[in-house]
Amino acid sequence: MKKVLFLLFLIGTIFTVSISASVNIPLNDGWLFNRGFQASSSGMTKVNLPHTWNAEDGMFGNTDYYRGLCNYTRKLQLPIQYQGKRIFLKVGAAQTVADVFVDHHFVTQHKGGYTAFVAELTDFIKPGKESTLEIRVNNAPTMDIAPICGDFNIFGGLYRGVELIVTDDVCIAPDYYASSGVFFTQTEVTKEKATLKIETLLSSKATSLGG
């Protein structure tokens, strides 16, 4: 029993450190959306996430639905007290290809509409100064990204949440395939005991992980 309690205390301590060392800022409200290549203020619609542009034309098995490029943009302005912190963008899912820009500067591209991804924005955002975040999402058919075909429609959009993660310079890595950065492996189980291996990925600006 003492071993079990100590293990639970250790696990709780790890997650407490992880939570206290980061701030999560939801970005689900206040987006401007439009179809097409250029994101212009004219013709844009206000939307909140989660969002898909195929909510109407992709229903009831309709195969003649829009598959192409769309733009999501919104303003960002972090408090000045976050100066010196690291800033990450986490996208829950974007169907199918997503390109991220800050103030028209390319940040990253993610392929695959069913997995989350994280991009570091530290070099692109200055706390106290307004920035424009743009995510271009494209659900056009492509032969190198699954699913290539199926008996279902590929609904384009940012159909899960988006958030900023603010951390210290040294942190539990949020950008390792958008995971928690903490991994548990069960190495031994008997009637008398169970052994867990706990690995924590740490990241600093000099050794940032991508994924």
List each model region and its residues.
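Positively charged n-region of N-terminal signal peptides that target proteins for export
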Residues: M1-V4
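Bacterial N-terminal signal peptides
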Residues: L7-T16
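Accessory carbohydrate-binding/adhesion or oligomerization-edge regions at the termini
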Residues: S20-M59, T132, R136, T142, ...
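A short, compositionally biased
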Residues: P26-D29, A94, L209-G210
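Accessory beta-strand-rich segments of carbohydrate-active enzymes
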Residues: N34-G36, R67-D175, S179-G181, K205
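Beta-strand-rich binding/interaction modules
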Residues: V102, K191-G211
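Short beta-strand segments of immunoglobulin-like
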Residues: V182-K191
